[in-house]
Amino acid sequence: MRGPLGTEEELPRLFAEEMENEEEMSEEEDGGLEGFEDFFPAEPVSLPKKKPKKLKESKSSKGKRKKKEGSNDEMSDNEEDLEEKSESEGSDYSPTKKKKKKLKEKKEKKEKKEKRKKRGEDEDDNDDGGLKEPKSSGQLMAEWGLDDVDYLFSEDDYHTLTNYKAFSQFLRPLIAKKNPKIPMSKMMTVLGAKWREFSANNPFKGSSAAAAAAAVAAAVETVTIAPPLAISPQQVPQTLPIRKAKTKEGKGPGVRKKNKGAKDSKKKGRGKRVAGLKFRFGGISKRKKGSSSEEDEREDSDLDNASIHSSSVRSECSAALGKKNKRRRKKKRIDDGDGYETDHQDYCEVCQQGGEIILCDTCPRAYHLVCLDPELEKAPEGKWSCPHCEKEGIQWEPKDDDEEEEEGGCEEEEDDHMEFCRVCKDGGELLCCDACPSSYHLHCLNPPLPEIPNGEWLCPRCTCPPLKGKVQRILHWRWTEPPAPFVVGLPGPEVEPGMPPPRPLEGIPEREFFVKWAGLSYWHCSWVKELQLELYHTVMYRNYQRKNDMDEPPPFDYGSGDEDGKSEKRKNKDPLYAKMEERFYRYGIKPEWMMVHRILNHSFDKKGDIHYLIKWKDLPYDQCTWEIDEIDIPYYDNLKQAYWGHRELMLGEDARLPKRLVKKGKKLKDDKQEKPPDTPIVDPTVKFDKQPWYIDATGGTLHPYQLEGLNWLRFSWAQGTDTILADEMGLGKTVQTIVFLYSLYKEGHSKGPYLVSAPLSTIINWEREFEMWAPDFYVVTYTGDKESRSVIRENEFSFEDNAIRGGKKVFRMKKEVQIKFHVLLTSYELITIDQAILGSIEWACLVVDEAHRLKNNQSKFFRVLNSYKIDYKLLLTGTPLQNNLEELFHLLNFLTPERFNNLEGFLEEFADISKEDQIKKLHDLLGPHMLRRLKADVFKNMPAKTELIVRVELSQMQKKYYKFILTRNFEALNSKGGGNQVSLLNIMMDLKKCCNHPYLFPVAAVEAPVLPNGSYDGSSLVKSSGKLMLLQKMLKKLRDEGHRVLIFSQMTKMLDLLEDFLEYEGYKYERIDGGITGGLRQEAIDRFNAPGAQQFCFLLSTRAGGLGINLATADTVIIYDSDWNPHNDIQAFSRAHRIGQNKKVMIYRFVTRASVEERITQVAKRKMMLTHLVVRPGLGSKSGSMTKQELDDILKFGTEELFKDDVEGMMSQGQRPTTPIPDIQSTKGGSLTAGAKKKHGSTPPGDNKDVEDSSVIHYDDAAISKLLDRNQDATDDTELQNMNEYLSSFKVAQYVVREEDGVEEVEREVIKQEENVDPDYWEKLLRHHYEQQQEDLARNLGKGKRIRKQVNYNDASQEDQEWQDELSDNQSEYSIGSEDEDEDFEERPEGQSGRRQSRRQLKSDRDKPLPPLLARVGGNIEVLGFNARQRKAFLNAIMRWGMPPQDAFNSHWLVRDLRGKSEKEFRAYVSLFMRHLCEPGADGAETFADGVPREGLSRQHVLTRIGVMSLVRKKVQEFEHVNGKYSTPDLVPEGAEGKKPGEVISSDPNTPVPASPAQLPPAPLGLTDKMEAQLGYTDEKESGMQKPKKSLEIQTLPTALDRVEGEDKHQSSDSKDRAREERTEEVEKAQGSPEQPLKEEVLPDKEPIPDKPELSLGHSGDFRPDDPKTEEKEPGETQQNGDREEDEEGKKEDKNGKFKFMFNIADGGFTELHTLWQNEERAAVSSGKIYEIWHRRHDYWLLAGIVTHGYARWQDIQNDPRYMILNEPFKSEIHKGNYLEMKNKFLARRFKLLEQALVIEEQLRRAAYLNMTQDPNHPAMALNARLAEVECLAESHQHLSKESLAGNKPANAVLHKVLNQLEELLSDMKADVTRLPSMLSRIPPVAARLQMSERSILSRLTNRAGDPTIQQTSSRRRDFPLFQRSFPAEPSHLPNPRGREKLQPF
């Protein structure tokens, strides 16, 4: 690893090299000097090291080595060179250097040597006479005529400029500023002198800065004076046989290490090889110079922490490279510090630039690869001469022998030992290990060495003894005693100047680690040295170092959990315990881990000695270990005897204890297990009056009801009736089950095996109960990870070794293998995961605890368990009817599938009967299968439980945070889409946290005062939370009265705060949350339940602490924050109210008043009613998730009052609020707020203090005493006992809130209430606060205070409302409208309805509240007051007429069953129905998101029908003003014909009218088709609501294609090809039904199709439908929509005063419709039978009849005189018997064709609107060319057929050829057509176009403010009112991403 530049060791060398380079380069031109800057790069460049080719002069003796034996003679020239090389290079040596040089180079080198020698002699002379004083910087600058820089260095400068690099960076710009043209060489010299002077004047001489300065000053001196050759002071005479150990002069961690490859090359000999080509980086860019010294320091520290093996790793790499005979040339890069040891220039000869350059082997030139001519792509192999040398004829020559020897000498001197001490990471004289690269200071060894040892020396690492095995984990560490010190001799070799003096030579203490060995038990734990751990478990050691404090050993951890006092007493009494505690327990080893739980298996070794596989208590199976027979472990012999006894019991005599072990076992013979009888000895149908003998033997006593349960279970078993034991929680279902299984075993009925599946958290409790109540059972707990389960399968399932294949993968068990266990305990998950093994065993009985896991027959658990081979099933559940009857049926279906297998039949039985009857019927049905007892039935004298809701105030700090959260999230709350559901949930969670405690927010936690031990200051902790203030008072009284408390919270962080609170108050406590696992959990429960336990409180998380825990010793439960799911809270407080409880249980549920918590409590209660009152399939809420509306409602609760406090506070201070207080209606449940308002009203004005106090809850001593009074009446549950206490209404403590008089009452069985929503609530409430906050933020960010514009937000919202009202398409019908919206509904334009209600009626309707969303009346479900029959009638009406029109309430659309409903109720139900229709989700779901039953509603079919009816209605309205109302106008009375078209449209109450909030004038006769289409579009806005997805998707575009089609008629014949091409394009655009035959696309070639739709439509953005010019053109164009014959006919009739008729469907020729019309009209016109032959006219009136009478009401349409024309074509068939059937079939078939054409027309319109085009090169376009070819061929040979018929044989032959050609062309076309669907461009789904999900599009649609696209175009729309109404932004109204599929049935 390279260190940064500028370290102390490198600076002298670095500086000297710079100066020498300066000398060499000063002879060259100035351009070459730029390379100097690169010797001081700002950040190191890590590049491969190369051995320099040319030797440079030595600058420093620093890197010099101690000489070996033969190195002490006087130095020859070669040796001198060698020394110089080793000195100057340090660790730069690399084996990749060249071994041979050219002759010329050799000569040059010799000359240089002589010069150097001469210079060296001069320097020696100087040495003798003393050194000359170097010139000062002032002298130098004066000498060179430069301006000196006068800068006075401050004390700070001496502190900061601690190295040469920093100094240079600081001073160089100052010098350059005064002397802009100073040469680089002079700059460097001046800087060196300045640095020397700066260092000499440094007042901090002892600091590292001074040391660095001295080093560089020394380097500066070497510019002119070379140092004398350093000879090692410790020279040993050559004759001595004993050599000293190897030493070296290390350079510290900042220096590169030498490469190891030298040794390898030496070993291999000097065979020829291709030398590496030299590369060099010159002129490194200046950008790299800007880094600070911080980076250098960071790299230094990185180096210190780097892997200790880095040098050897690098060396190995180098060695590997050296082994190749031929190697590629390596690119040589510049080194950071040492510079480049060659004479080559560091810039390109051609471009004079630096970079990666290739060096010539025969001259100093260098080149870029790209600058050579020709250019080289890569470096050439071998030696390379540059173009200049080749031109001159200079060639490379090998070196002669003496130079090779010189190279060899270098190699011998090469060393790969570390350059720094391994202990202190510092340089200096180092002792090198002979076996590894490690180096050490003598004083760093432990114990330190006084002198260098003789002979070979091995470091501590090489002499470290190996470990006895693999370490599994580190348990503890400690300091050892230091080794005895050596007698300190003379100090070691001299250290560098500036280094601290060596430490005294005394040993230092080392760490020792207490470790657990892998594969060995905790009995074998032992201590190991730190070095052993570091060497053999490096990663584990480093991880431990990182996670633990390595200065102080960890405190002793008594794993047993005993308190110090108890353990001291026990140690005094029990010396064995004291010994174990000292050896094991204090290091965190639990006593249980050293106790044998069970012996699993045995084996014999080669000597015949026996070994046992032992499972240890409280440790998983993968920690099992093999132990020898003679080990001294308590109770080992007893367990061995039990092991052999169990083998004998299960396998018989063969499995006895081996004979040689019998003696040891004799004395334990009496403990042998009793064998169960082979045949039954007791009749299971006979009742036990008292508990049987085998239960007495356990020492336990069953309660009478438990004995009754045992009798019932045994009887059911005998009868073969599978059962559900459904006793209420806390009545001991576990004990009854275990005793039942034990009775089967002990009485000889069954030997097992039994499978028990239970929640993972309760399995420990099951184990304990089995141990207590069934001691003879061999119970195996099958849980844990893969390794543990693998051990269990191999050792616990069978006695045979090969019964199951080993390994982690699960395999089946062999058949007829003896099972080892009696009972297998496992979790739900493993039932499914390890199905292979568990499913292969035949189980005598299955027990499923918490069996409501089986309520869904689609769950994997249900399906897998159903496949097991089970003789008898027993299910345990405390909540058998948790949700609904369907779930109960699934339980019964699992039990007895042969009896309960028809879900529909089962549910029908319970469909229409009242709740009481359902209960009775259920009782009869479940009688044989289910036993359920309640605590109230069983324990008549069991203390009752009382639950109180305790409302708590927010503290001031909480209020601040509550407001802040709401204000900060204003945008999310106020987003017009209602906000993202996830973001609303996040806001709610933040508010819940705030209600609990503000310290749950990191900001508050950081600011909170903290004690020295890290816990929060108690007083501020309490004051910050209203709940804690109350809790403090309550706990004080509860403690004084001797009660014990359970405190539940959902949040584990809240439990942390409660811990701090209890510590502050001085209460002892226990805690369980999700992170505390089985063993620790049970210990905590045992400690709390122990007699005389000191623990006063038990902190539990609601979910983790709610299952399988018995804490009956506590009698007070405080639910600190309610859970989302009320069942979890019930489970929680049932921990205390259970068997063993002898005191009354008080349950206090803390609820923060007027906050989200209070609202959540109400919603949770309502949800509970929903899931339990409704015993009806599909109504149970499957998901506990809140709807977005519920979330919004919860968030609003109490906010009005909270923010009103601010305003009142300002009023009391005489201030005026800046914004008016919005009049926000109080949400339901806000009775408290209402009460507070009343109180305000009665308060005298000005008495604000009293006003404030009146609405705040105060808890004084009297209130607390009353709250804790246990003589209050128990919660009255008697009325609700039918549903087993699930609806126990919460009793609200009336005294808590002073104003509250009454208790909440349940009026009727309201399951769910739909609530009105004010969409502008957040706008009114938070806008001002939000803007204020944004302003504060801006000011704090330094942007200055802005002047706020005064805005009246009420005005703004009214303005918004005005323009939104014009866009009724965007108003939300998905939630019930507010009062204002209701008024919009009622204020209808005059004349639209003949039955207008009076104002009084409307007002009474409006004031009457809506029925609840879900309610139960007489056993039946009502949705918004609609019963099942009415809901069915409404659906039928939708399927008949499509969307209800605006005036549906006053038309025949309102069928008889719906006429009893008020208009408000009807509209509310329409809104709800449409919301459900637009709700994404599977049709298979039982309910919608809000819990309303689906009742088999198929969203697909309903949307399809609505869409088709909408298209039909729109098409009829398009032509209605032209065609009138009557199909046969000559038969119509005169009065009817004279009506205005507008009246004609609306006069029939059954025909839906165009509805718009603003009154529209009736369409005049001249209105364009497009305008009509737009008016038709508004038809879908009935009842102020959006159309659902289908109709939205179908009716988006104007009918511009109709007009375009008319224009087509005027195209000249030569444009026919273009028309065909466009038609083909339309084929590709169309999104029509895949069912329609594709071949029809090419048939109607005479049919006009749209040509260039883009011309008429333009881009959608530029489309302006109400442009007056367009309107002028359109009436004429409208008449061109028909065919030519039709046009002519229409004109003729118009002139003669006859009626006009106009009708067309622009299907683009994709259906047969126009072909049929042409043929039919030709026949009708030619025969004159306009009425009798069915054609276009009849199709129009068929559609008009469908609009009036509904879908497929053929008979009604035929009987209507308005549509008499439809009967005319069939008059001739009237005498036939199947006349009606034939007529209806024809109408149905014809309507299907029209349907298809309408859909295609709509799709074409949309394609044109979106400007969809097909690439002309697309293969599909080839179809057009083929068609032209076919037509051309056919037309040009038409005459042939006549000639052929006339007998012309040549013509006949030609005709045959032509026909063959046509056939081939047509077959090719057919092949192309089959490929079309996959190639055509499709209109992407709306969701894809908008890049929004279906749900988010729906959110936009359901919001009043509309989506952003509307808002963006609002200004344009204000100018065009018609466009506003009829053209809402198209994409956002197409929420159905599967639009194409929905059109398929047509």
UniProtKB/Swiss-Prot annotation:
Family annotation (PANTHER family): CHROMODOMAIN-HELICASE-DNA-BINDING PROTEIN 3-RELATED-RELATED, CHROMODOMAIN-HELICASE-DNA-BINDING PROTEIN 5
Physiological role: ATP-dependent chromatin-remodeling factor that binds DNA through histones and regulates gene transcription. May specifically recognize and bind trimethylated 'Lys-27' (H3K27me3) and non-methylated 'Lys-4' of histone H3. Acts as a component of the histone deacetylase NuRD complex which participates in the remodeling of chromatin. Plays a role in the development of the nervous system by activating the expression of genes promoting neuron terminal differentiation.
Protein name in the entry: Chromodomain-helicase-DNA-binding protein 5
Basic and acidic residues compositional bias, start-end: 563-573, 1602-1629, 1637-1654, 1661-1676
Organism listed in the record: Mus musculus (Mouse)
EC number from the UniProt entry: 3.6.4.-
SMART domains according to UniProt: CHROMO (SM00298), DEXDc (SM00487), DUF1086 (SM01146), DUF1087 (SM01147), HELICc (SM00490), PHD (SM00249)
Organism classification: Eukaryota, Metazoa, Chordata, Craniata, Vertebrata
Ranges of biased composition (kind: Pro residues): 1551-1564
GO cellular component term, pick one: heterochromatin
Phosphoserine modifications at: S1556
Domain Helicase C-terminal: start-end pairs: 1030-1195
